[in-house]
């Protein structure tokens, strides 16, 4: 049922039949276990007309499934499907008054659907097993979800994280957009964000890396629930994901629990990731801009492609 890639007494790397890559590091000097799921999909994989989608999906995967967070799924489901259809209509509507009417209807149906859901249940369940530091982040190439938990709750944690990926329901879609906009506005006031966007715009012109991960305001104002669902169905599959566990647990006792939980996830064919052209910049290119209150100097060098044997070494060198 597994293919082993690397192994020693404390570290094991292997793959389940469904393609999920598993990394286990047994470290009894740690007081608990740190658990991560990583999906090989980030902002570079989202449509250019729906920027911020990968990050928004990260937020929505805390909202539960048809079991977690569902007080009465039979009543919530038709309302949820109606909300999806209304967002499809909104995306095709250009008249301002007509859009306002559709948005009003989305509000009404969302309020009705909220009667049958508890969107914070996943977070509450993690907290209930002693989980701490529940969080996630979206990068250009990956999206990661993580928290720490007591080792004796290993099976429960694995069950919750695997269930999270089984029939997720993106409830409170409209309300969560306010949180994303708060984050967007916070970055607008952050000098380092302006600097990074300027630098990446120069280094990666014509590449998805030049886009800000959180997305453009015009796309955030026109959320596309159907595209978010399609993005999830395309990339969030076990053969495109990894499970990482580090800490005070027994590797051999944990393997059957992983098979029992994450082994149930169904693999699906993956599309090829879009390949963007990259152009190495010429020797000694220089740019300047007035972006903040303090002078800053950034120096960038041509590197190696993602996955190159020297990538990790360059990452370490960059941190020194």
Identify the residue ranges that each predicted region occupies.
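Short amphipathic alpha-helices in soluble, non-transmembrane regions
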Residues: 159-164, 256-262
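Active-site recognition of the HExxH zinc-binding catalytic motif
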Residues: 51-63, 315, 319
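Metal-associated gating/positioning segment near the N- to mid-region
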Residues: 48, 60-72
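Non-catalytic beta-strand/loop surface segments
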Residues: 5-45, 69-152, 186-240, 251, ...
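M16/insulysin-pitrilysin zinc metalloprotease superfamily fold
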Residues: 64-66, 147-177, 320
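Solvent-exposed, non-transmembrane alpha-helical starts
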Residues: 46-48, 155-157, 174, 307-310
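Bacterial N-terminal signal peptides
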Residues: 1-3
């Amino acid at each position: 049922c597994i293919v082993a890639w690397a192994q020693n007494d404390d570290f094991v790397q292997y793959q389940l039949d469904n393609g999920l890559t598993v990394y286990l590091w047994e470290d009894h000097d740690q007081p608990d276990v740190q658990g991560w799921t990583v999906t090989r999909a980030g902002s570079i994989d989202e449509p250019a007309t729906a920027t911020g989608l990968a990050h928004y999906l990260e937020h929505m995967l805390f909202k539960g499934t048809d079991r977690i967070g569902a007080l009465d799924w039979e009543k919530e489901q038709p309302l949820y499907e109606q909300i999806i259809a209304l967002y499809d209509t909104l995306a095709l509507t250009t008249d301002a008054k007509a859009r306002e009417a559709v948005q009003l209807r989305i509000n009404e149906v969302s309020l009705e659907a909220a009667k049958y859901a508890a969107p914070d249940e996943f977070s509450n369940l993690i907290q209930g097993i002693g989980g701490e530091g529940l969080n996630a982040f979206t990068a250009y190439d990956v999206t990661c979800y993580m928290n720490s938990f007591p080792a004796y709750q290993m099976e429960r944690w694995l069950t919750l994280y695997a269930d999270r990926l089984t029939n997720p329901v993106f409830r409170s879609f409209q309300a969560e957009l306010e949180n994303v906009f708060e984050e967007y506005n916070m970055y607008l006031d952050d000098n380092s964000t302006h600097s990074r966007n300027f630098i990446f715009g120069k280094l990666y012109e014509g590449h998805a890396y030049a886009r800000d991960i959180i997305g453009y305001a015009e796309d955030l104002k026109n959320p596309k629930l159907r595209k978010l669902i399609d993005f999830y169905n395309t990339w969030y599959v076990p053969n495109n994901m990894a499970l990482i566990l580090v800490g005070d647990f027994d590797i051999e006792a944990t393997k059957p629990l992983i098979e029992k939980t994450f082994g149930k996830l169904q693999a699906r064919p993956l599309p090829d990731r879009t390949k963007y052209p990259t152009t190495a910049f010429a020797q000694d290119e220089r740019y300047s801009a007035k972006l903040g209150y303090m002078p800053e100097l950034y120096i960038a060098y041509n590197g190696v492609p993602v996955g190159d044997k020297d990538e990790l070494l360059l990452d370490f060198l960059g941190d020194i």
